[in-house]
Amino acid sequence: KLSDYLGKKNVVLFFNEGSMCYPACWNQMAELGNDSRFNTENMVALSIVTDPKDQWLDIVSKSTNLTKSKIIFDTSRSASKAYDVLNLNSSMHRGSLPGHTYFIIDKEGVIRFTMDDPNMALANDKLIKEIETLK
């Protein structure tokens, strides 16, 4: 849960279309999980999908580059609705699925950066640059 990190870590949230968004979303999820800059004592990256957990357990078992990815399952879409990501430009399924959207939340729980990316590019370096402004 996001609240587990409150007061402890800066958090990157990556809302995405999940299993159907191959390869772009899978690649970003893997990059966030495998990039040591996002997995430190001060920071964590969480990928948020609306797919069922068992579906992703199967995907991760076959795609070892995803094993370090921290995945949150938003099957009810309550987090996606709360962060208002279901109707942004990057969503290919407006109203029902998030697209390719990032949030940086500081240790105090304040959203410090938001980026919706219809191009679905890998964003690690851009996110790190934004996170460095929090220090």
Where are each of the predicted segments found?
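Structural micro-motif
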Residues: T67-K70, V85-S91, G95-F103
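Residue-level structural signal for beta-strand termini and adjacent loop
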Residues: S3-Y5, V85, D117
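Extracellular/periplasmic catalytic domains that process cell-envelope and extracellular macromolecules
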Residues: D4-G7, N39-T40, T64-N65, S96
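Structural microenvironment flanking redox-active thiols in thiol-disulfide oxidoreductases
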Residues: P23-I72, S78-K81
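Short active-site neighborhood of thiol/selenol oxidoreductases, capturing the structured segment around
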Residues: L2-A30
